[in-house]
Regions:
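Short alpha-helix in the Rossmann-fold core of NAD(P)-dependent oxidoreductases
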Residues: 4-5, 39-40, 84-87
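Residue-level signal for short amphipathic helical patches enriched in basic/charged
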Residues: 4-7, 101
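Catalytic loop of short-chain dehydrogenase/reductase
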Residues: 8-42, 47-56, 68-70
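Catalytic Tyr-x(3-8)-Lys segment
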Residues: 28-33, 73-90
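Flexible, glycine-rich beta-alpha linker
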Residues: 59-79
Length: 127
């Protein structure tokens, strides 16, 4: 990307990075949620660090987080009582939109996918 003069890196994160708790999973016997949330929090921090390092190369580094649960086979197996979910296609569309933003104006951010689709996130400059 440096040789190409720019680009976009999008890390996929989760609301679990910011909101501890059981989430949609009724059975915590596996003990995976603290590790999952902790790894997503670390990924958001890494996103900010790499964005800082690559800003001069016009490479945007952002994290995309589901604004609402994405109905995947795993979630549908473990989760209960979700009335409002997002489709994987909707999330993918948000990733494409985020990849097209100006790297000088949106980088180092964790953005919910609905904010990308409705344009409600605010670009900013590094100046």
């Amino acid at each position: 990307m440096i040789g190409a003069g720019g680009g976009a890196i999008i890390n996929i994160t989760s609301v679990a990075s910011r909101l501890p708790g059981d989430g949609p999973y009724a059975d915590r016997s596996g003990g995976v949620l603290p590790g999952y949330g902790g790894s997503k929090a670390a990924l958001e921090h890494l996103t900010q660090c790499v964005a800082y390092d690559l800003a001069d190369h016009r490479i945007a580094v952002n994290a995309l987080s589901p604004s609402k649960p994405i109905l995947t086979p795993g979630l549908s197996y473990y989760a209960r009582d979700f009335d409002d979910t997002a489709s994987a296609d909707e999330f993918a569309r948000a990733a494409v939109e985020l990849a097209l933003v100006d790297p000088g104006r949106v980088t180092g951010r964790t953005i919910g996918h609905l904010q990308v689709l409705d344009g409600s996130f605010r670009p900013f400059g590094l100046d």
